[in-house]
Regions:
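Short beta-strand segments
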Residues: 20-22, 40-42, 91-96
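Short, flexible N-terminal segments of the mature chain
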Residues: 18-37
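Short, well-ordered, aromatic-rich surface patches in folded extracellular/luminal domains
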Residues: 1-14, 66-158
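Short N-terminal edge-element motif at the start of the domain
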Residues: 1-7, 11, 32-33, 38-50
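A short, structured loop/turn motif at beta-sheet edges
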Residues: 26, 44-51, 85-93
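Generic secondary-structure microfeatures
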Residues: 34, 56, 87-89
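Short, low-complexity, polar/charged sequence segments that are solvent-exposed and flexible
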Residues: 25-30, 43, 102-105
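Charged, amphipathic alpha-helical segments
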Residues: 47-73
Length: 158
């Protein structure tokens, strides 16, 4: 995670090509990109940066999570989601998931994380993935309320 970044989100296609990105620095500068172009920049108040850190602090489970533990949906193709989160106490986590937005799709099947014990085809409830999405959505709501276009904060192609 870059030194002065408190939140960073990158959505790529299955081949790793960037679709959108939002990055929030410690000083409150927000940079938004779509398809590798800088398309929006704005400034947050310190209170909003602190709010983002506070949101992460409220979801402490994600700070102890590893990308290999995140449950994956049974989707052949799709997207990759990259998250950097920083809590109020300075703890940081960097996570990568495949198609994590599918936690919102009713009836979608999920398998255990890549290195979790158990059968590879064992269907599970995506508890860790849901916690990451919930944290992300709370931060996204704060950013949208402060002028960031929601198109930079999508979890899937759509």
């Amino acid at each position: 995670m870059r030194e002065n970044i408190v939140f960073d989100y990158l959505l790529t296609n299955a081949w790793g090509l960037p679709l959108c990105r939002v990055s929030v620095s410690e000083d409150g500068f927000v940079q938004c990109q779509e398809n590798r172009e800088n398309t929006q920049g704005l400034q947050l108040e310190k209170a909003e940066v602190d709010k983002i850190k506070s949101i992460v602090s409220e979801h402490t489970h994600i700070l102890d999570c590893d990308s290999k533990e995140l449950e994956s949906p049974d989707v052949f193709d799709g997207v990759m989601n990259f998250f950097d989160f920083e809590a109020s106490d300075g703890r940081k986590v960097n996570l990568m998931a495949f198609n994590i937005g599918e936690v919102k799709t009713h009836g979608m099947s999920f398998s255990k994380g890549l290195l979790e014990e158990g059968e590879l085809d064992e269907i599970v409830v995506p508890v860790k993935a849901m916690e990451v999405v919930k944290t992300f959505e709370e931060i996204a709501a704060t950013l949208v309320a402060n002028g960031v276009d929601a198109k930079y904060l999508r979890l899937t192609y759509a």
